Amino acid sequence: MLLSEWISFLLVAVPPRSRRTFVELLIGCLLNPEGWVTRAIGAIRREAHWTTYYKLIERAQVPVTELSLRLLQLVLTVCPTELVTLILDDTLVLRGAKSGPGISIKHDHSHKANRPTFLNSQCWVTLALVVRVRLGSALTVPIRSWLLEESGQRGKLWVARQLMDSVRG
């Protein structure tokens, strides 16, 4: 399959009004090795005002569950396998700001050198698909991530369960 066919496959999950903006952001993410949205916007020649990109993401104008299912289907079509291996991982993303979505002081279990035990950060739980490419080697394709709330009843295990349920077919 060609890249254009991959994009067309994913666009089925995107409302027609949002498709152009979605493709611009997707291409920006492909051009940018870090994957950050702000870098993706900087990597493209913007055809729309920055608020258009903000609204697409922040207001969830793209159905994330449907898009993640399409991505999973695409990867399984391109790399067919009998055994599907999904992994769940939680990641702390350090933040300088004191307030924002999901930002709070969290315990860092990684015990990295020159890093305090408690960090001002966000916690993301990610569901990914492991794709075997060669004997003994594999790629990991992130399917969907979920920002953990800074407080409340929804812990990492609850979020992990929701992520698994969202791709169960």
Ranges and model annotations:
Residues 1-169:
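Conserved, well-structured functional cores that handle cations and Mg-NTP chemistry
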